[in-house]
């Protein structure tokens, strides 16, 4: 079993902010409007439309012209309108002749055109305001090869990056490690830490590197586990094994050994499912769902997982038992305890599938094993709720520090798993504008985004400090705007945030703007469908949230000391938050 607060590992961040109308009260245009610009519909483009670099640029420009939501604001950062971009760059792309990269051109000519095309696209995209936006473009490199290049805006230089996993040990040492703290870095890079500060009793620190709370810190457990029913069609016991062995194995000696091995494997499974370890884990998992005492959930689930038969740990986790018999047979191949049984192929085939059917259909093993393994791999399922949300609800957390530094965003549903407890009044936290139709400068009015009080609200304002850096993006920024809408008890500290609050959807028919997906095999767009302003009307895209307490950028030496947990290291952001909340 792992030691919760001491886990250290890698991280992966930057998930996009996805729209959830149930949370924000936003409305979406129900369908894409007719193309008033009389251009070809985006979905109608195909590879036959791209025969040259000029064609490639034409398709790129047309998609942006129809779907990009921020052309009107581009004038603030560029001396060119979008039409002027076309007039300057269309002739440049037309002058590149080697898109077909045939033997009519030398390799050097192909690669020179490749370099120019990349330069031109980067010059255009450098001025893009939207910080979620990127485009992948496939270009010829030689007579027989292509490359796909990702182009992002470099409009704003982002330097302040302070991810939680890098300063994990230093921050952990600021917390009371008396059983009230929790922390974890999961195998897929989710990183979270929470606990009371040693120097400031009642002040709680919570930091995480991406908004993936729902998938890591919550789980819907069953109301009960591991039923048994001897009358089930799928019931398996020693007598059935004996009967089938007599039917399928003629050699008495081989039959006896095969029967013994099969019966022993079944007994091992039954003994485990009836064990105290499994029972205690089941009790805590059901208690989590039934609002009972689930303390010790992680420890007991880990114990039950670790003592489980090795075969269970080798099998794929799936609800479908079809073909599971073959999976069992394959996993047993290397185990000397079952070779006599496996050598009787007809019996082995029957037995392995019968065992799978019994475990999956009568004992409902999938539900138990899936939930047990999830808990084993996510100690924060217990920690986030028992050591953060419950003390918060009880009023034990008097002040709160939220560390969003290095947090690139994630799922919008996570807002409800944090902010719902801290919202005490309905408030407008932002304004959103979308495309009204496919004309480049046709927009909806600015639509107010409201956060409302839910039944989870604590009904009291908790002094809160939010730590930000240049890589606090997307949902980190939206969550900050939501909490800031609640009043002056919420303060922000650090550097300007990333500046990426626009909304994304994978449904390209849901709105008149934005596009996620390919347009021909040469172009892949990742384009938001909206633009966001804060409650005061400030455009934050590419600018970011300016903190209430703007700190000087951390030096390389400062960061290195914090990363190495040097005795002289000082986290100025955390220190400032503690001063403000004192």
Show which residues each predicted segment covers.
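Bacterial N-terminal signal peptides that target proteins for export
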Residues: 2-15
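Sec-dependent N-terminal signal peptides of Gram-positive bacterial secreted proteins and lipoproteins
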Residues: 15-23
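C-terminal motif of bacterial Sec signal peptides marking the signal peptidase cleavage site
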Residues: 26-30
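Flexible, low-complexity junctional segments that flank or bridge functional domains
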Residues: 32-401, 406-408, 413-416, 424, ...
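Extracytoplasmic/peripheral linker and loop segments enriched in polar/acidic and small residues
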Residues: 94-104, 300, 306-307, 548-582
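Conserved acidic, small-residue-rich alpha-beta core segments centered on
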Residues: 306, 312-315, 394, 399-401, ...
